[in-house]
């Protein structure tokens, strides 16, 4: 069985107004695991921990369900939140693995110049100092898992450093 992973990537310098959303319909352990995984990454750069938002989780679940039902993988249009997406085909992922994949983009972020070499928008959203809440959810589409996290307030504002 072949497993592929995909994630939405941003062009360097693009404005990402997105966030993490979580679903209250999913297990409480998903919320705990996602929050812990995000906060481990944030602690590495001295940023305050996020709190879990059932409101954002519900919104994330709605969007994940929408993507799964329509066999799509794209950001929610006109969202007032920050948003990270993750997709795995032919396998499954844990919350820690999803966040670790996004966080691996840290290697492409240069704090000194505030520039990305490649993709780093998922990472910078996770560590965005102004973001206070996160909510995440997952939906299945046959062989695919689609993960959505919503963040409030959103990060990735052009010209500003994440922390």
What are these regions (language model features)?
Residues 15-23:
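Hydrophobic h-region of N-terminal signal peptides that target proteins for export
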Residues 85:
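Acyl-group handling in specialized metabolite and lipid biosynthesis
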Residues 3-13:
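Bacterial N-terminal signal peptides that target proteins for export
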Residues 22-82:
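Short, well-ordered surface patches within globular domains
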Residues 6, 43, 161-162:
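Positively charged, low-complexity intrinsically disordered regions
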Residues 78, 91-163:
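Disulfide-stabilized extracellular recognition modules
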């Amino acid at each position: 069985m072949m497993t592929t992973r995909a994630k939405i990537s941003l062009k360097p310098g693009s404005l990402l107004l997105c966030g993490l959303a979580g679903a209250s319909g999913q297990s409480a352990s998903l919320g705990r695991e996602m929050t812990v995984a995000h906060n481990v990454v944030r602690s590495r750069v001295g940023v305050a921990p996020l709190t879990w938002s059932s409101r954002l989780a519900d919104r994330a679940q709605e969007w994940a369900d929408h993507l799964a039902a329509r066999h799509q993988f794209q950001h929610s249009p006109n969202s007032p939140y920050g948003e990270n997406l993750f997709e795995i085909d032919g396998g499954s992922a844990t919350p820690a693995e999803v966040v670790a994949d996004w966080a691996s983009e840290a290697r492409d972020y240069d704090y000194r110049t505030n520039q990305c070499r490649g993709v780093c928008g998922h990472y910078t959203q996770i560590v965005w100092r102004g973001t206070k809440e996160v909510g995440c959810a997952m939906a299945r589409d046959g062989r695919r898992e689609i993960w959505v996290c919503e963040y409030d307030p959103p990060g990735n504002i052009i010209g500003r450093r994440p922390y």
